[in-house]
Amino acid sequence: MKIATWNVNGIRARESQFVDWVRRDSPDVVCLQEIKATPEQLSETLTMLPEYWNYWHGGPKGYSGVSLHVRKSTHTTRPRFGHPDFDVECRVVQTEIDGGVVVLSVYVPNGGKDYPAKLKFLEAMLAYVEGVHARGGQLIVCGDLNVARTDVDVHPKERKPGAIGQRPDERAILERMIESGLQDVGRVLDPTNDRLFTWWPPWRGLRQKNQGWRLDYVLSSSAGRRLDPIECRVLADVGTSDHAPVMATFQLATT
């Protein structure tokens, strides 16, 4: 099973890129962030993407917004989509795929305008993850978490002490989340890559130089071994967003 996440930085500007990409790579589950549109503002091409069960959770006034798409050949009946209690500003959508695995598409606040609100969101997300695992559930968290986990996840020229996205307190919450029973799939499969970036500042050709940050993640439950990651790629060739898609491939045990 292929599960992908992408901060599109405006789906209306990236419509054809999104459609071309999913038809090229055929992910079974797609999580989008920062769609910057309400469902009413989307074209029929997007709302009726025929290969998928589609759920658009758009923010007001073209702000924020996430979506989730489940391939019909993977999930034969329309899954139930919903929002956990910690969802604010249309930042989270969840569903359960075959096998009882809960998938989240998450867009964590950047924190530039209200850093305490970002920490509150991350703490609530941590509590949610802990609750799922306490009930024996399995979870895949996909999205733009707006935190570079360690200094290795930031290009040396972009490392700035005290910069939002690199602060010890936000990193500590992300680390507690992982320690609560998640695995950072990109790092599990590529532990020493110091150029594994998913976001680049949009100036001076920094994407071409791969001078970026790793802000986009696929995190999966590590207990139970129902979810066995076998590949995770940053698709830097896709689209013109300042983020690249990340696609992980899992072998899902049937028991």
Can you describe what each PLM-predicted range is?
Residues 82-83, 107-122, 158-163:
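Surface-exposed cleft-lining segments at the edges of enzyme active sites
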Residues 61-77, 196, 204-226:
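Conserved beta strand-loop-helix elements of the APE1-like EEP
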Residues 70-72, 95-99, 221-222, 241, ...:
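Active-site beta-strand termini and strand-to-loop segments that position acidic
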Residues 1-48, 53-56, 63-66, 254-255:
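N-terminal, active-site-proximal structural segment of metallo-dependent hydrolase catalytic domains
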Residues 50, 123-215:
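Metal-dependent phosphoesterases centered on the DNase I-like endonuclease/exonuclease/phosphatase
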Residues 35-109:
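Structured beta-strand-rich core segments of catalytic domains in phosphoester-bond hydrolases
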Residues 227-236:
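Low-complexity, intrinsically disordered Gly/Pro/Thr-rich segments
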Residues 3-7, 22-42, 103, 129-151, ...:
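Active-site beta-strand/loop signature of hydrolases that rely on acidic residues for catalysis
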